[in-house]
Amino acid sequence: MNKTKIYINGKLIGTCDNPEEFVEEIRAKRRSGEVSHEMNITHYPENHEIYIFTDPGRARRPLIIVEDGEPLLKEEHLEKLSSGEMEWDDLISQGIIEYLDAEEEENTYIAMSPEEVTEEHTHLEIDPSTMLGICAGIIPFANHNSSPRNTMEAGMTKQALGLYASNYNLRTDTRAHLLHHPQVPIVKTRIIDVTGYDERPSGQNFVVAVMSYEGYNMEDALILNKASLERGLARSSFFRSYEATERRYPGGQEDRFEIPEKGVRGYRSERDYRHLDEDGIINPETEVSSGDVLIGKTSPPRFLEEIDEFGTVAERRRETSVTVRHGEEGIVDAVLLTETVEGSRLAKIRVREQRQPEFIGDKFASRHGQKGVVGLIVSQEDMPFTEDGVVPDLIVNPHAIPSRMSVGQVLEMLAGKAACMEGRRVDGTPFTGEEEKDLKEALKANGFESAGVETLYNGITGERIEAEIFIGVAYYQKLHHMTTDRIYARSRGPVQVLTRQPTEGRAREGGLRFGEMERDCLIAHGAALALKERLLDESDKYEALVCAECGMIAIYDKIRDKKYCPICEDSESFPVEISYAFKLLLDELKSLCIFPKLVLEDKA
């Protein structure tokens, strides 16, 4: 018989002969309070291993213990809890409820409801929705969705705009988003109640129609009602903070907040400094755009200057002002002046920008993993409308539902519609929420089709749309992926010092990468001159002088106006167009003591 190895927090500490008895005894001691209730034990019989975990930071959740087919939590316990005679900790210390981690759940058989409990079951869920975390717990009717959609939504909830902190006005976060009119979801769950999500929601209730519209909502694109946006739907503010410090340097030199003078090295234009006050700092509520100076600042030179004719060192300060980022604009929201721990002056400027979905490309998502970007913003008069004159805020494509099996969204729209007609909020808690048939009856009682479909009319022609359109109310979240932050174009701009190629990235006003696959497309088309233009002329074209004898890159002495080869000296050299990156490669090969020789031929 194989001995079973025992591990504590992954470390082998011994073996035992009767693993089942050992595990049962340890669990009994935990339930009686002899061993800490924060310990978990798991037996893997196929591997002959027992794992005991006491590590901090493990995810654990409470379950009701079942013995001989009977849950240990009785009606009398619930009454005592309600009256205050008992507390939650008493249930744990009395061995009625225990916390299990993911490892110990491997040894359990958990019943979802008291009716399901049999003698084989070891535990019972307090409520089926407790198996979900906070992010998954706010999804209504999550048990009707496929699991990848729920996982997707659990990630996207964290990206949704809302009231991220109630003291946002006093904070200077590097970047922050704030939704102007967050609403509590009409279809809620019990986890929403428990976590206080209603106090700081992160979305709005949209009237949603499921239909195609002129092909503009293909591939998860969304169509938004322009009038709804003008009334404040999905409107948000974006805050960005900038800061600068008057640093002190060895030798008594220091930075200064001021409006730089024209003699300062790196001086911009007068227009860039037009918003600054006398102290070099901008005033609140000033409109600013890309490149405007927010904090005027000068710094001492990095190196000592040459001694002038009077034998003194002339200090020529350099410009180090803080400017609005490239591609951003807004209004100065707040100016904070304070000191650092070292006693240096510190200035922080918060700029706010109002964001309304004006462009296509802003990202939205329902609570069922149905994410999409705005494909078209339509005037209200061109939107389809119902017999009662209701115009949807949002149109989603019907192809988004069947293959993804997000039936929870269909139920939420049904429940949202019923809730609006009855003036109440619907409980969409997974497994235990309101039944579909009750929602359908509520719709029927209010004069609607029980399936949630309605007749819609074309807003452009006024004709009745042949198909019945499913329309309801769903909670949608605006995510922080916005076109304003992503859109980018460049004609001319800075280049890198080393390679002389355009810089990379939107923040550095970089070029758009013309990659290998784009190059292959032009090769396939046979567009040789277009290829040369992209990869040479518009990138890092360099005219090198090449020695006709030895093939080494020659030198041009500007003072003497003379070309010569460093090896052959007086030999003839010719200009050759090459990429500067290639010239850099030749230089690096020389540093490795490899002599790259360029062989020149006459042009064909």
Swiss-Prot record:
The annotation note on the cofactor reads: Binds 1 Zn(2+) per subunit.
- Protein purpose: DNA-dependent RNA polymerase (RNAP) catalyzes the transcription of DNA into RNA using the four ribonucleoside triphosphates as substrates. The Rpo2 subunit (Rpo2N and Rpo2C in this organism) is implicated in DNA promoter recognition and in nucleotide binding.
Provide the species name. Methanothermobacter thermautotrophicus (strain Winter) (Methanobacterium thermoautotrophicum)
Q: Chief localization class?
A: cytoplasm
Q: What is the lineage of its organism?
A: Archaea, Methanobacteriati, Methanobacteriota, Methanomada group, Methanobacteria
UniProt binding sites for Zn(2+): 547, 550, 565, 568
Instruction: Kindly provide the name given to this protein in its UniProt entry.
Output: DNA-directed RNA polymerase subunit Rpo2C
Catalyses: RNA(n) + a ribonucleoside 5'-triphosphate = RNA(n+1) + diphosphate
One Gene Ontology BP term is: DNA-templated transcription
Q: What is its EC number?
A: 2.7.7.6
Q: Which Pfam families match?
A: RNA_pol_Rpb2_4, RNA_pol_Rpb2_5, RNA_pol_Rpb2_6, RNA_pol_Rpb2_7
In the UniProt entry, which residues are flagged as the active site?
348, 481
Q: Where in the cell is it found?
A: Cytoplasm
Gene name, Swiss-Prot/TrEMBL = rpo2C
Q: Which family does it belong to?
A: Belongs to the RNA polymerase beta chain family.
Citing just one GO molecular function, the answer is: zinc ion binding
Keyword annotations: Cytoplasm, DNA-binding, DNA-directed RNA polymerase, Metal-binding, Nucleotidyltransferase, Transcription, Transferase, Zinc
- Under the cellular component aspect of Gene Ontology, which terms does the record hold? cytoplasm; DNA-directed RNA polymerase complex
Quaternary structure per UniProt? Part of the RNA polymerase complex.
This protein's cofactor list reads: Zn(2+)
